[in-house]
Amino acid sequence: LSRAFERTYSYLQGGTRFSKSSQALRWVLGLEVQNSDLQGKIIGRNESIDNGFTNVLPSANLRYQFNQGSNVSVNYRTSTRDPSLNELQPFVDNTDPLRTYAGNPNLTPQYQHSLSADFRRFDQFTFRNVYAYANVGYNRNQIVQSRVIDAQGRQTVMPVNLGDGWNGNAGVNLTNGSLGITAHA
């Protein structure tokens, strides 16, 4: 089985951002369009891959300065993760008979939404500092590695689009002079 493969990958992205600033408030709104196209041909076989994807990627950023030592920020952005050539190639790699890998030409890009917020307050006279943050992410068409183990203990691994998924974290950091406390979740 030959793994010879010819490919052409093109990627275009363009967009615009609008921003406004005042002494206390700064905001930015953005919108981008992304187009990617992967065309490939398996040498010696009559098989090809032709995947093209277009995505709209909005973004927003807001920062408010309460005073010189305190501010809050909120950020939203979107991004994509295109499948790699290795993930898309319809080949079975059986160099390790206990763990075979098969590409998946039907993968679609993963689309990610990220929302984050943080608050900062610092008193320059007492050196007290408060920093708190929270992040949440939503992924559509997550690309994950599917593993199937047969009765003899052999693994077959293949990338698949899992569907939707969420993730998040939050934390706070409090400092009073030289003493600090940090908590993350």
Region spans (language model):
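Gram-negative outer-membrane beta-barrel proteins
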Residues: 24-26, 35-43, 50-52, 80-86, ...
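Outer-membrane beta-barrel channels and translocator barrels
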Residues: 22-25, 65-69, 112, 122-126, ...
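Surface-exposed extracellular loop regions of Gram-negative outer-membrane beta-barrel proteins
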Residues: 9-48, 53-63, 69-113, 136-154, 160
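Transmembrane beta-barrel strands of outer-membrane/channel proteins
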Residues: 1, 14, 29-35, 62, ...
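Outer membrane beta-barrel strand-and-loop segments of large Gram-negative receptors
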Residues: 1-5, 102, 108, 127-185
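Transmembrane beta-barrel architecture of outer-membrane proteins
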Residues: 9-15, 53-59, 102, 112-116, ...
